[in-house]
């Protein structure tokens, strides 16, 4: 399972809110030897795959042409809407 991701340069609460208005959501990749990376993902791509067990076993994120193997560590969902607010990924 592969998803395209973009590195975020604009960080913070306001930037995250603006990002969510464009049908994307913020996420972070951490773990391993590399430094943590803030990314953005397209909501429609991810939400359609979250009900499959393979999603939680490990996925591939394509960031600037480089593939990174990750596993979802934490998912923050909207209280009553079927939306993802933020995700944490751990490098595998």
UniProtKB/Swiss-Prot annotation:
InterPro entries: Rbsml_bL25/Gln-tRNA_synth_N (IPR020056), Ribosomal_bL25/Gln-tRNA_synth (IPR011035), Ribosomal_bL25_short (IPR020055), Ribosomal_L25_dom (IPR029751), Ribosomal_uL5_bac-type (IPR020930). The keyword Cell membrane does not apply. It holds the Pfam family Ribosomal_L25p. Keywords: Ribonucleoprotein, Ribosomal protein, RNA-binding, rRNA-binding. Transmembrane segments: none annotated. One of its GO terms (molecular function) is 5S rRNA binding. GO terms for cellular component: cytosolic large ribosomal subunit. Part of the 50S ribosomal subunit; part of the 5S rRNA/L5/L18/L25 subcomplex. Contacts the 5S rRNA. Binds to the 5S rRNA independently of L5 and L18. This is one of the proteins that binds to the 5S RNA in the ribosome where it forms part of the central protuberance. Belongs to the bacterial ribosomal protein bL25 family. This is Large ribosomal subunit protein bL25. The gene is rplY.
């Amino acid at each position: 399972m592969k998803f395209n991701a973009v590195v975020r340069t604009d960080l913070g609460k306001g930037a995250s809110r603006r990002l969510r208005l464009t049908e994307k959501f913020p996420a972070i990749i951490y773990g391993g030897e590399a430094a943590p990376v803030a990314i953005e993902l397209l909501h429609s791509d991810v939400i359609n795959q979250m009900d499959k067990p393979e999603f939680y076993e490990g996925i591939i994120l394509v960031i600037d042409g480089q593939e990174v193997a990750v596993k979802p560590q934490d998912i923050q969902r909207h209280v009553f809407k079927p939306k993802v607010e933020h995700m944490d990924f751990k490098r595998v």
